[in-house]
Amino acid sequence: MRVLGIESSCDETGVAIYDTEQGLLGQALYSQVEMHARYGGVVPELASRDHVQRVLPLIREVMTEANTQPQQLDGVAFTAGPGLAGALLVGAGVARSLAFGWNLPAVAVHHMEGHLLAPLLEPNAPAFPFVALLVSGGHTLLLDAKALGEYEILGESVDDAAGEAFDKAAKMMGLGYPGGPRVATLAQQGTAGRFRFPRPMTDRPGLDMSFSGLKTFTLNTINDLGGKEALSEQDRADIARAFEEAAVDTLVIKCRRAVEQTGHKRLVMAGGVSANQSLRAKLAEQMKKRGVDVYYPAPQYCTDNGAMIAFAGALRLQAGERAELPIKIRPRWPLTELAKLQGAD
């Protein structure tokens, strides 16, 4: 089965073609980061307009790269949510129009299921069941992934997502947008032990998380040093290191509890923050002690991309799922509302 996938939930336009026998045949991605950076964050209206301009040229590019004609496709997959409503409508509208014109089935894909399944694109793919940590700018979830489409939430952030906290901490330090990668890079130059930030909600049972307190602690630390303008480069590096260490420790502690609670010996981490090298190293170290194998997507599949949507769509189309004819999106869409796919175990 060969599927065209379209991702447009936020500020990346991603297109890919995935074949269940040959793997990924082609992909293209356009990031709007530079456009949104001047505003310090994503502007939904600008994101939607840019998707309109980019998506069809990217589809043509990928079809050429994959040496694929419309008649060789078996379906079209698109991100239906969660995400920005206008951005989702662009991808959904184009996908449904192409599917109708090419007489192909279409399938709606949950954005976070796409992330969750991205590590399965790798040669050494994990089998169900496993614990999954989905950690990005919009979501931070710990899941018991029992089968394709059967997910139980073990814990989640009760306030800000981890990636959002990284971005806001970066903004407080004057590092610009997007802040997560900049904080991680700067943290490598930080002095260990100069500052120690709290590890929120790790002193109580349960798997829920909180990251808003880290933002407050960051702001208070900056103010204690005389404000953002008074910070030296070493101050910024030391704050970045303390912030990253606290966020990483919090996530690792919760993952450790999750594998102990479920008894699973496989852990998947996906989403934009899964590219953080400190988080990967600390998680691998802790899971190795417990005999748990850890799986990540390749770096290019950590952030939003079309490959994960094409892949997830292919699995759902194989199981007989089809999108209804009216174009429907779900800007808010709990992952637990996905139906388990019959025969997908």
UniProtKB/Swiss-Prot annotation:
EC number annotated for this UniProt entry: 2.3.1.234
InterPro entries: ATPase_NBD, Gcp-like_dom, KAE1/TsaD, Peptidase_M22_CS, TsaD
Gene transcribed to yield this protein: tsaD
Cofactor note: Binds 1 Fe(2+) ion per subunit.
Record family assignment: Belongs to the KAE1 / TsaD family.
Needed co-factor(s): Fe(2+)
Binding-site residues, Fe cation: H111, H115, D304
Protein name (database record): tRNA N6-adenosine threonylcarbamoyltransferase
GO cellular component: cytoplasm
Catalysed conversion reaction: L-threonylcarbamoyladenylate + adenosine(37) in tRNA = N(6)-L-threonylcarbamoyladenosine(37) in tRNA + AMP + H(+)
Keywords: Acyltransferase, Cytoplasm, Iron, Metal-binding, Transferase, tRNA processing
A molecular-function term among this protein's GO annotations: N(6)-L-threonylcarbamoyladenine synthase activity
UniProt-listed GO biological process terms: tRNA threonylcarbamoyladenosine modification
Protein species of origin: Alcanivorax borkumensis (strain ATCC 700651 / DSM 11573 / NCIMB 13689 / SK2)
Compartment list: Cytoplasm
Role noted for this protein: Required for the formation of a threonylcarbamoyl group on adenosine at position 37 (t(6)A37) in tRNAs that read codons beginning with adenine. Is involved in the transfer of the threonylcarbamoyl moiety of threonylcarbamoyl-AMP (TC-AMP) to the N6 group of A37, together with TsaE and TsaB. TsaD likely plays a direct catalytic role in this reaction.
Positions bound to substrate: L134, V135, S136, G137, G138, D167, G180, N276
